[in-house]
Amino acid sequence: MFPMVTGFMNYGHQTVRAARYIGQGFMITLSHANRLPVTIQYPYEKLITSERFRGRIHFEFDKCIACEVCVRVCPIDLPVVDWKFETDIRKKRLLNYSIDFGICIFCGNCVEYCPTNCLSMTEEYELSTYDRHELNYNQIALGRLPMSVIDDYTIRTVLNSIQRKTQ
């Protein structure tokens, strides 16, 4: 009879412990109910990129001296630089410059080592297309500056929505 009583006591302790664990889990669940949602509605709300965000590369044709430093420092030799040597002025003349963003790893080496600062990183990260050949940008496409997420009036940024909720 004595082992039977201790068995009932152990069962009671285990039941109380299980109820305590369930209660703790329920309290954690209730504490999350007061928090703001973490997910964003992507096409309508966008995160503001950080200052050093490495997005699409912007290229300024007039500044480029066709030195090909960007090609040498690129880990995958990606930028295609076509130039012609002008004998009368004894300098290279840039003919064509292109980058295939389907292959680019956005490391930023080309921007960092460019001696004339003709390359820069933008905050544009929406490069999806239906055809991968559309990701090959020439100097004209690389020269276009993207619209800033902050300046776009059709998009509510997460920073603005948080400021509205706190007011």
UniProtKB/Swiss-Prot annotation:
[4Fe-4S] cluster 2 binds at C74, C104, C107, C110. Keywords: 4Fe-4S, Chloroplast, Iron, Iron-sulfur, Membrane, Metal-binding, NAD, NADP, Plastid, Plastoquinone, Quinone, Repeat, Thylakoid, Translocase. Residues 55-84, 95-124 form the 4Fe-4S ferredoxin-type domain. GO terms for molecular function: 4 iron, 4 sulfur cluster binding; iron ion binding; NADH dehydrogenase (ubiquinone) activity; quinone binding. GO terms for biological process: photosynthesis, light reaction. InterPro entries: 4Fe4S_Fe-S-bd, 4Fe4S_Fe_S_CS, NADH_quinone_OxRdtase_chainI, NDHI. Pfam families: Fer4_7 (PF12838). It is an enzyme of class 7 (translocase). Binds 2 [4Fe-4S] clusters per subunit. It is found in: Plastid, Chloroplast thylakoid membrane. Its cofactor is [4Fe-4S] cluster. [4Fe-4S] cluster 1 binds at C64, C67, C70, C114. Disulfide bonds: none annotated. It is a peripheral membrane protein. Its EC number is 7.1.1.-. One of its GO terms (cellular component) is chloroplast thylakoid membrane. It catalyses: a plastoquinone + NADH + (n+1) H(+)(in) = a plastoquinol + NAD(+) + n H(+)(out); a plastoquinone + NADPH + (n+1) H(+)(in) = a plastoquinol + NADP(+) + n H(+)(out). NDH is composed of at least 16 different subunits, 5 of which are encoded in the nucleus. Belongs to the complex I 23 kDa subunit family. NDH shuttles electrons from NAD(P)H:plastoquinone, via FMN and iron-sulfur (Fe-S) centers, to quinones in the photosynthetic chain and possibly in a chloroplast respiratory chain. The immediate electron acceptor for the enzyme in this species is believed to be plastoquinone. Couples the redox reaction to proton translocation, and thus conserves the redox energy in a proton gradient. This is NAD(P)H-quinone oxidoreductase subunit I, chloroplastic. It comes from Gossypium hirsutum.
